[in-house]
Every structure is written in C-alpha cells, then in structure tokens.
C-alpha cells in the first residue's frame, strides 16, 4: 500500500481550508484517510499551518511520500530539514 501525505479540501465555496492527511494513494482526494496530521489555511495573510510534527516525522520515516504542495509546506515549516538530519546523522 503506497501511502501519501496530501491535502484534503474542506470549507465552503470560495473559502477553502485544507487538512493535511495521510491516505492510501489510490483513495480519492476527499475520501478515506488514515490519519490527520495538520491543517493549512491559505486565506489568512501568513498562511496559517498547524502540524503534529512527531506524527509527520513518523510517517515520513515509514515511507510516506508527501505531495508537491505538502512538501513545500513541510519545507517552509522546517520539518523536512529535521527529517533529513535525523535520517543522515551518524
């Protein structure tokens, strides 16, 4: 089972916000998911992001692949740097 970390659209028409979910790559965008690991609100000025960093790092360590947008969000929040440092530190 290929697992992805991706965005699920919530909110009303013209006012979206997104949940950052871990889901099977074959399930639909707003369909079944395994776990919610954060939220993303693009409408506020500073693009509000909340993350459960420990869970995101655990899923990345288990092989979950982030989507392009989620990869950018995780990079801006510094989570990918922590993952890289923990993976390649000796």
UniProtKB/Swiss-Prot annotation:
UniProt GO molecular function: structural constituent of ribosome
UniProt keyword Cell membrane present: no
Keyword hit for Ribonucleoprotein: yes
Keywords: Ribonucleoprotein, Ribosomal protein
GO cellular component, one term: cytoplasm
GO biological processes: translation
Family matches, as Gene3D superfamilies: 3.30.1320.10
Pfam families: Ribosomal_S16
Family membership: Belongs to the bacterial ribosomal protein bS16 family.
NCBIfam families: S16
PANTHER family, A to Z: 30S RIBOSOMAL PROTEIN S16, SMALL RIBOSOMAL SUBUNIT PROTEIN BS16M
Entry protein name: Small ribosomal subunit protein bS16
Source organism of this protein record: Streptococcus pneumoniae serotype 4 (strain ATCC BAA-334 / TIGR4)
Organism classification: Bacteria, Bacillati, Bacillota, Bacilli, Lactobacillales
Gene: rpsP
